[in-house]
């Protein structure tokens, strides 16, 4: 087997090879990827970025899943995923698939499999795509090569879906809980796919932490490029939450990659009815479709990314409370002397006015670095939309990557339509929080729910937000079940996780502190832990 490009202590030569590979793979408008068909939906190879969602009903409730699939399709989503945690659910999905194909024949169905390889083998016979998680696929035995053969015979595609919170013990032991571990987890399976001549493969590298997510996808693109692989990518931020905050967080992570032409299909995971995810995803893809359709090279300023795979704050001088090691500020937060510094040029404002704001901002920073200019940088852009959600998602998709990469010291969002400054300031703070640059409020990490969810997730999240939103800087996770729950909330201070029907386990950090308590007592018990 080929030696991994990654190692726990990667030397400078390997890092430089990966950096060059990333730059080469993203040199054009869009990363080149092969075409993969998921049922009748073609992704990769220049096809428009596809949007998708996942049902949140028990898969054995076939009528509810069929109805929900119809609502997703009506909203514009042609790829729909269902959870198949056991053979009973696999058989239920077979029934669902037959009816969905009768009613909506252009809809592709994806089976989501964790822990039980035998289920993956079963659904490969009728699903348009099978999703497996390398972190738990072999926990109970099973041959990956045999699954590939079943997919080959049926025409099913395969998604190798890596989750930051559920890496295998082997990968955690070799690389730690890191983007490197995520990438090597995927590459191990991709090398088998190539060896077996199976190329109907899609990969995802999801995390609830946008920095980790972006770094993992970038490193995967580079690692695949070095090994001559061009598989398409499915993008998403896990456990993004709900409402405007959830949409902003998804736009920050997904937009950071689409800005560099990376991504072939996306999901905006929201703790809301799944059909709500489709217009949110369409807003992101439309924003970048408009940019890439315009004239221009769309890839200048890459030199600003000195370290694409890890956070590295750009070195700037401090002027009052901005620049240096200070957290990024909003334009409206500048004090009188700092505002004077803005007007007399001691603070640089880089305003993007063209269709490619990330490119404009990066180019300007490259010029400043070349000139030895270490003034603090405030990024500025004016948006025409009068719709608050649209403005927020566009701004998040543009500004987020700049703060994920540590390239700016301040943010300035203007609205040509007269959106109140209080609203644009609130959006700016949410962007900074989503990009991990500055915490200004409680952060809620919550999964969208699926057929494994063990309680009324959306209602519970609403109550948790109502009672705990005043705890600035605290991260609280509300998770539907134990499959991704404990892992994907590893970044949280406290967690509320479904353990069994009507039962909740509470976590402090990564440790369970109250197990299997009645749901009606769980929120009060969580508050008592704080």
Where are these regions (language model features)?
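Glycine-rich, proline-tolerant flexible connector loops at the mouths of alpha/beta enzymes
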Residues: 56, 74-100, 134-139, 201-210, ...
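Catalytic alpha/beta core domains of metabolic enzymes, predominantly
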Residues: 163, 171-313, 345-471, 475-478
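Hydrophobic or amphipathic alpha-helical targeting/insertion segments
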Residues: 106-110, 114-159
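Short, acidic/polar
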Residues: 59-71, 115-121, 186, 250-254, ...
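Alpha-helix-loop-beta-strand connector modules within alpha/beta enzyme cores
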Residues: 87-111, 147-156, 220-229, 368-372, ...
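Conserved, mostly hydrophobic/aromatic
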Residues: 51, 112, 160, 203, ...
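N-terminal amphipathic alpha-helix/helix-capping segment at the start of soluble metabolic enzymes
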Residues: 8-53, 152-153, 290-334, 462, ...
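Active-site mouth loops of central-metabolism enzymes
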Residues: 45-64, 83-85, 107-115, 135, ...
């Amino acid at each position: 087997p080929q030696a991994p490009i990654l190692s726990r202590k990667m030397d400078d030569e390997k890092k430089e090879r990966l950096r060059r590979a990333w730059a080469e793979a993203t040199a054009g408008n869009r990363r080149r990827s092969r075409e993969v068909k998921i049922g009748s939906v073609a992704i990769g190879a220049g096809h428009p970025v596809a949007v998708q969602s996942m049902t949140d009903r028990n898969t054995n409730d076939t009528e509810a899943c069929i109805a929900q699939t119809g609502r997703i399709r009506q909203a514009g989503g042609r790829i729909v995923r269902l959870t198949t945690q056991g053979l009973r659910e696999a058989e239920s999905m077979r029934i669902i698939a037959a009816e969905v194909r009768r009613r909506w024949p252009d809809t592709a169905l994806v089976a989501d499999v964790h822990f039980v390889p035998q289920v993956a083998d079963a659904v490969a016979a009728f699903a348009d795509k099978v999703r497996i998680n390398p972190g738990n696929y072999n926990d109970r035995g099973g041959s990956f090569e045999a699954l590939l053969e079943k997919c080959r015979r049926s025409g099913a595609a395969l998604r190798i879906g890596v989750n930051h919170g559920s890496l295998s013990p082997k990968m955690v032991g070799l690389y730690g809980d890191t983007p490197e571990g995520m990438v090597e987890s995927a590459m191990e399976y991709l090398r088998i796919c190539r060896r077996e001549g199976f190329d109907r493969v899609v990969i995802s590298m999801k995390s609830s932490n946008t920095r980790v997510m972006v770094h993992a996808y970038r490193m995967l693109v580079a690692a695949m490029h070095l090994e001559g692989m061009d598989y398409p990518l499915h993008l998403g931020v896990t456990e993004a939450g709900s409402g405007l905050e959830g949409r902003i967080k998804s736009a920050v992570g997904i937009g950071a990659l689409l800005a560099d032409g990376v991504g072939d299909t996306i999901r905006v995971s929201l703790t809301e009815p799944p059909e709500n995810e489709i217009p949110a995803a369409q807003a992101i893809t439309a924003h970048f479709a408009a940019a890439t359709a315009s004239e221009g090279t769309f890839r200048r300023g890459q030199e600003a990314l000195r370290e694409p795979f890890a956070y590295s704050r750009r070195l700037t001088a401090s002027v009052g409370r901005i620049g240096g090691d200070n957290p990024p500020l909003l334009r409206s937060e500048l004090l009188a002397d700092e505002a004077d510094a803005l007007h007399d040029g001691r603070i640089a404002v880089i305003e993007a006015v063209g269709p490619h704001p990330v490119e404009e901002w990066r180019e300007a920073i490259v010029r400043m670095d070349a000139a030895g200019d270490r003034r603090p940088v405030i990024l500025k852009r004016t948006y025409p939309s009068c719709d608050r959600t649209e403005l927020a998602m566009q701004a998040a998709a543009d500004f987020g990557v700049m703060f994920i990469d540590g390239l700016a010291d301040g943010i300035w969002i203007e609205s040509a339509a007269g959106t109140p400054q209080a609203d644009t300031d609130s959006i700016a703070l949410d962007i900074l929080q989503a990009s991990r640059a500055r915490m200004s409020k409680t952060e809620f990490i919550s999964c969208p729910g699926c057929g494994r969810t063990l309680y009324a997730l959306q209602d519970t999240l609403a109550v948790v937000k109502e009672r705990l939103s005043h705890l600035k800087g605290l991260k609280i996770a509300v998770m539907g079940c134990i499959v991704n729950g404990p892992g994907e909330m590893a970044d949280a201070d406290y967690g509320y996780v479904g353990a069994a029907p009507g039962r909740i386990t509470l976590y402090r950090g990564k440790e369970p502190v109250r197990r299997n308590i009645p749901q009606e007592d769980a929120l009060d018990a969580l508050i008592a832990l704080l």
